[in-house]
């Protein structure tokens, strides 16, 4: 081992520069508020569909009324039906878990299956 290496491991370790000083325009953007779609929270009521009335009567599987028609995704139909999870879904990026379904709602405001993460009201995963 080099004797100089034991004395000076990192010559810049004593320098501390806050990130705002490195890019001052970021500090100004932060004060002005979020401007990108990624930093804005999702609107809670983004569905255009009206809430379904909860009719008392016999319940099917998973507590849903037994008389409802099969699940119809709101998208272009590329995703297969049944992508709702019984528990929290995997949290990796790119997981196909945003199955937006209007006929088997978990809450009255967005009509999505449980743990779909389409809206903030359905986000159970931290």
From Swiss-Prot:
InterPro entries per UniProt: UPF0574 (IPR018904)
Coiled-coil blocks: none
GO cellular component terms listed in the entry, alphabetical order: cornified envelope
Ranges for region Disordered: 1-89
GO biological process, one term: establishment of skin barrier
GO molecular function list: identical protein binding
Family: Belongs to the CYSRT1 family.
Protein purpose: Component of the stratum corneum that may contribute to epidermal antimicrobial host defenses.
Protein name: Cysteine-rich tail protein 1
Organism, scientific name: Bos taurus
